[in-house]
């Protein structure tokens, strides 16, 4: 296997690319929603199965600038004759971004299928042995989230669907489907994203720690990623609710997994005393904040305590958090940095105070909540 091509979600292409790099190391850029990696081992595939924003994984893939449809079809046919394993096949054609003028999904599928078809390669649209997947990757629509690469030129990508890669869907565990629900619950995709962004190429994670577990959204996704869970909350109702949700997950959704979990009722400053030293920790949390969200520093000191406690528990772990910020950040496509308020403080001050506690920020990305609130997704690694 020479390499893999990863196709990502259109929800936040910039974070998709960051997530891919966190999971498999350096990636090559093809399109805002398509990257390539040379990592193909079992560890890489296992990490990719934990992703939030990777939608498809292709092997033996190629890509091209947009040329005449007939030329593209012939290139895919020639490639298919050389790379398609023996057995039945189907051709799937997808559009990401804006549609490409002059290209028809059905015509590409039919003509590629007809060109590759043969005794060793019968067509089976229902249950094929192999799938040729084509992506017509048009220009990205103006994004909801800032992306410096969204004006990149369109591409056409094709390859074999990697049968050994699977990622669980999001059905069956939305906040309202869990035994214990509160309106503050984090959606599964965002919770999973925080975990995957906590991966690093120089170490393998073992445990996800959430010092503000709420209803257990992050803890649930950690268990489904087959990572151990340590969670705490000061509110006994939340602790009981998280335990109820994790028991449900362990019995109904991941009964065959070996991941363990523990939920404690304690203040964030006591976290090191509760669990001691941990190796391979991802600290993933959504800290509580006041009613005025990004304009208020309510909860700021609690956040800093969590940063200090995390460094004490695992001095070589990683940290990923969501902090309330000014929604104007979502419209910022300028090259000049603006010191937006985050939890009532200028972002530069927040980053400096994290550094004082041993955490160097390596990634920030705004995430839209609604028109009056955004959150800043922050990833930090040990500063020394």
Locations of regions flagged by a protein language model:
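Short secondary-structure capping/turn segments at boundaries of alpha-helices and beta-strands
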Residues: 24-26, 78-79, 120
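A gly/proline- and charged-residue-enriched helix-loop-helix capping module
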Residues: 102-120
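Conserved AdoMet
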Residues: 38-83
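Class I S-adenosyl-L-methionine-dependent methyltransferase catalytic core
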Residues: 1-53, 97-103, 107, 128-384
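Short, charge-rich binding segments
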Residues: 79-84, 123-125, 148-150
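Phosphate-coordination loops involved in phosphoryl transfer and adenosine-cofactor binding
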Residues: 85-88, 205
């Amino acid at each position: 296997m020479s390499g893999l091509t990863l196709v990502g979600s259109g929800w936040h292409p910039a974070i998709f690319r960051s997530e891919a790099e966190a999971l498999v190391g350096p990636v090559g850029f093809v399109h805002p929603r398509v990257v390539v990696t040379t990592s193909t081992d079992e560890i890489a595939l296992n990490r990719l199965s934990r992703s939030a924003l990777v939608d498809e994984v292709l092997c033996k893939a190629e890509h091209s600038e947009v040329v005449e449809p007939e030329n593209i079809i012939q290139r895919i046919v020639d490639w298919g004759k050389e790379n398609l394993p023996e057995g039945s096949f189907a051709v799937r054609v997808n559009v990401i971004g804006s549609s490409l003028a002059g290209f028809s999904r059905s015509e590409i599928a039919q003509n590629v299928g007809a060109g590759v078809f043969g005794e060793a390669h019968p067509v089976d649209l229902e249950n094929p042995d192999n799938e040729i997947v084509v992506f017509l990757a048009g220009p990205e629509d103006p994004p909801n989230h800032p992306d410096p690469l969204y004006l990149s030129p369109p591409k056409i990508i094709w390859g074999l669907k990697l049968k050994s890669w699977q990622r669980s869907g999001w059905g069956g565990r939305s906040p309202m489907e869990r035994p214990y629900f509160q309106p503050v619950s984090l959606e599964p995709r965002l919770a999973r994203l925080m975990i995957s962004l906590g991966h690093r190429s120089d170490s393998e994670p073992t445990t996800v720690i959430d010092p503000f577990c709420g209803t257990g959204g992050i803890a649930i996704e950690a268990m489904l990623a087959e990572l151990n869970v340590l969670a705490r909350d000061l509110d006994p109702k939340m602790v009981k609710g998280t335990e109820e949700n994790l028991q449900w997950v362990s019995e109904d959704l991941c009964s065959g997994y070996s991941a363990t979990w523990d939920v404690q009722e304690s203040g964030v400053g006591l976290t090191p005393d509760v669990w001691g030293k941990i190796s391979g920790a991802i600290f993933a949390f959504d800290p509580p904040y006041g009613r005025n969200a990004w304009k208020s520093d309510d909860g700021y000191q609690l956040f800093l305590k969590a940063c200090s406690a995390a460094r004490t528990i695992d001095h070589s772990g990683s940290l990923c958090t969501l902090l309330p910020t000014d929604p104007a950040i979502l419209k910022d496509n300028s090259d000049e940095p603006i010191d937006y308020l985050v939890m009532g403080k200028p972002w530069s001050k927040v980053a400096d105070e994290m550094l004082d506690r041993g955490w160097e920020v390596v990634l920030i990305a705004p995430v839209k909540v609604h028109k009056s609130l955004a959150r800043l997704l922050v990833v930090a690694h040990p500063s020394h």
